[in-house]
Amino acid sequence: MNGRECGTYTIVSQLIWREFFYCMSANNPFYGEMERNPICIDVPWYDIPEQLEAFENGKTGFPFIDAGIRQMRQEGGIHHIVRNALSMFLTRGDLWLNWEPGYELFMNYLIDGDWAVCSGNWMWVSSSAFEKSLNSSFCLDPTVYGWRVDPNGCYVKKYLPELADMPVEYVYSPWKAPLEVRQQ
């Protein structure tokens, strides 16, 4: 069995990313922010407090995103796939809001929060730094991404009890369900 088959490749690649972000943060006290951070580009983010508040409270209306926020707030941890989905949704994927409040939310709730790694990932996913070296040009559709990682909707139903009885074909986009289904 080679390293890729037993997971060694994945572990090593994640360690390399961690070290990359540690190196990039060295001697940069402003690494966890945009404005004074010399490696960040100036992105003209929107400033819509209502959208930020909905995101922070897991009430965006996008079940996979809301489940991720609620899991993080309840348990102090979320899978890296969910972290990336949340980061992309807040920034360049959907809301086009500054990544700094998302970074602060992660650091407040994630028990494994790491200043350099968390900041680095937010900069990467938001495309405010590292774009050429890390190629983060794709975007995730929050209604499709959940299907890819959890086709049965178990994750959403666990963290969004209001959707526990929603038929699986509508769990990631409940607004598409017929009215009689939504009223149940």
Model regions and ranges:
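C-terminal catalytic domain of photolyase/cryptochrome flavoproteins
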Residues: 1-184
